[in-house]
Design a protein with these regions (language model features):
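Extracellular loop-to-transmembrane helix junctions
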Residues: 2-19, 76-107, 116, 161-171, ...
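Membrane-helix boundary/coupling elements in multi-pass transport proteins
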Residues: 67-74, 91-93, 99, 103, ...
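Extracellular/periplasmic helix-exit of transmembrane alpha-helices
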Residues: 260-274, 327-363
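Membrane-interface helix-loop-helix modules in multi-pass membrane proteins
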Residues: 49-110, 121-125, 142-156, 320-347, ...
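Transmembrane helix-loop junctions in multi-pass membrane proteins
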Residues: 2, 68-70, 82, 141-158, ...
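Membrane-interface "cap" regions at the ends of multi-pass membrane proteins
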Residues: 13-70, 282, 286
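Flexible loop linkers connecting adjacent transmembrane helices
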Residues: 23-49, 75, 85, 89, ...
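Loop-to-transmembrane helix boundary motifs in multi-pass membrane proteins
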Residues: 125-140, 324-330, 375-379, 392, ...
């Protein structure tokens, strides 16, 4: 089979899944545009802002994509490109899309609150607090890691820093203008065209005016930006930046697809499936932890139930944003695999070691896009900058999500400190930023990062658990959620067990203990869920539910 044929077949499967399986899932969730969404019910102009579906899709897609659907699939090709593609397609359709849409709809039916609140309403208060501590800790780790990565990227590529600053300025202008023309479709289209054109121009301009600072300055500038992005109205900075940035990814997907079809490169990598890898371990469970974004990722549930659910205008918009957004990401993951299987297995192994996944992705697509008449170096730079731009999107979205998590954790607190943390977005964001700085300064994030893959997939399993219990409690057949849930618990518990034992043997006791704690956490939440179903408690009348 040729590379264009693989891409075409994958695209047809994903589109067919949206039209066929998607229809089944939409009916199971009883999506109804007559239901009032939280963005209208709790509209505050800061977090709850009803927005156009294309704008919300841009925010959601930009937030969930990042480097995940590029790095994970390319590393997982170590086991063979056929199992990687199969997991992306099966996982994206039956696991990830259900997980993302379910998180979004469950949140919308519960005041636009997070998965933690879904757990509280359906499993219990203890379950909520445990989940919130886990998700908050994970978000702080992600903020620290990405702040470090972006600061180093800006040092090595000052042009990327310049382009990123220009993007932020453009986003603020776009968000401000959009407030006055949002209700006028023709004007919105015009400012979108102008905004996207300027954004692509800023890609070029940024490379011409590199902006160089040292690591310390970039680190504090980035975290100051993250603070501002977390507390300002979502429609002023976060949403327009993500919306405009999403067109970089759309452009990347379009140019890459055309380039693959036009170049029609030979697939040099063999079809061998490796059950084990010297560096990674066994195909099960490692493949299913390594390919998260593109198949199923717990981080998506935090975005879907955190920022996105508060911006959905009508419930029907969640179909394309939640379910469709995941399938678009799956297609991007397929492109990532395509970018490296034009290498032989020996060339792949050497490049992975020397260059890393992002450079391999940039070089692979750059060479194919060059056949369209685009200078190869320009194409490679465009791909690399696109990936870097979405790292910044992950940083600002995670900061806002961590703020939401902290506020929800202390929601209903009677002590003065808890009340302040719950009600004051400036104080809660300040704590998020300070904790991130402390983690960076300590260097602890480099120690903790190896466990993120397993922790992220545990988030997915727990989100599916919350969705399943919620559906069962309102008398909906949850089999379509329970099957991926059981599989993901099997994957994550196996992965955590292996990880804990391996690190114990290597005397990396901190990682071993954390893995053991996460293992126990998941067991506790499963037991709490089982008890709640046996007791069948009444579900509080919060938000809109099924008719």
């Amino acid at each position: 089979m040729t590379l264009p044929a693989i891409l075409l077949l994958s695209g047809i499967i994903l589109l067919g899944a949206y039209l066929l399986y998607g229809k089944y899932v939409f009916e199971k969730f009883n999506i109804n545009d007559k239901n009032q969404t939280p963005s209208h019910q709790y509209k505050d102009g800061v977090d709850y802002v009803p927005s156009k579906p294309i704008v919300v899709l841009g925010h959601h897609f930009a937030s969930i994509a990042g480097a995940g659907p590029i790095v994970g699939p390319i590393i997982a090709v170590t086991f063979g490109w056929i199992p990687a593609i199969i997991w992306i397609l099966v996982g994206g359709i039956f696991f990830g899309a259900v997980h993302d849409l379910g998180s979004m709809i469950a949140s919308m039916r519960n005041q636009g609150k997070s998965i933690g609140t879904i757990i509280k309403n359906n499993i219990g208060y203890k379950g909520k607090q445990l989940f919130m501590i886990f998700s908050f800790s994970t978000l702080i780790l992600v903020i620290a890691v990405f702040a470090d990565i972006i600061a180093k990227t800006f040092i090595n590529n000052p042009g990327v820093a310049s382009a990123s600053i220009l993007f932020i300025g453009l986003a603020v202008v776009f968000g401000t203008v959009n407030k006055f023309v949002a209700d006028k479709k023709s004007l919105f289209i015009i400012i979108s065209i102008i905004g996207v054109a300027l954004m692509y121009y800023f890609v070029y301009l940024g490379m011409q005016i590199p902006f160089a600072l040292n690591y310390e300055l970039w680190l504090y500038i980035l975290l100051a930006y993250a603070f501002i992005a977390s507390v300002t109205p979502v429609s002023l900075l976060l949403q327009p930046r993500d919306y405009l940035n999403s067109f970089l990814l759309y452009g990347l997907i379009i140019f890459a697809t055309i380039g693959i079809f036009y170049a029609n490169p030979e697939i040099k990598m063999d079809t061998q499936v490796n059950i084990t890898s010297e560096n990674l371990g066994y195909l099960f469970p490692v493949l299913f932890v390594t390919i998260a974004c593109g198949a199923i990722s717990g981080f998506h549930s935090l975005v879907a139930s955190g920022t996105t659910s508060k911006q959905i205008d009508k419930e029907g918009d969640a179909k394309v944003v939640g379910f469709g957004g995941m399938l678009i990401e799956s297609f991007l993951a397929i492109i990532s695999v395509a970018a490296v299987i034009i290498l032989s297995r020996e060339e792949y192994a050497s490049s992975l070691s020397l260059k890393g996944p992002v450079t391999m992705f940039s070089d692979g697509l750059g060479s194919m896009m060059a056949t369209l008449g685009i200078p190869e170096q320009m194409a490679v730079s465009f791909v690399a900058l696109t990936v870097s731009a979405f790292a910044l999107t992950t940083l600002d979205t995670c900061t806002r999500l961590a703020r939401f998590t902290l506020q929800e954790y202390f929601e209903g607190a009677e002590n003065p400190v808890g009340k302040q943390l719950s009600g004051n977005r400036y104080l809660s964001t300040g704590i998020v930023v300070v904790l991130s700085i402390l983690l960076i300064r300590s260097g602890g994030f480099t120690t903790l990062w190896p466990i993120f893959g397993s922790a992220n997939q545990l988030l997915a399993a727990l989100a599916l658990l919350a969705i399943a219990v919620w559906l069962i409690n309102i008398n909906v057949n949850a089999t379509f959620v329970l099957i991926p849930m059981f599989f993901m618990f099997t994957v994550t518990l196996t992965s955590l067990g292996i990880f804990a034992w391996k690190n114990f043997q290597e005397e990396a006791y901190v990682l071993s203990i954390i893995a053991a704690i996460l293992f126990v956490l998941s067991i506790i939440l499963i037991i709490l869920a089982k008890k709640s179903l046996e007791q069948k408690p009444p579900i509080p009348e919060i938000g809109n539910s099924f008719k």
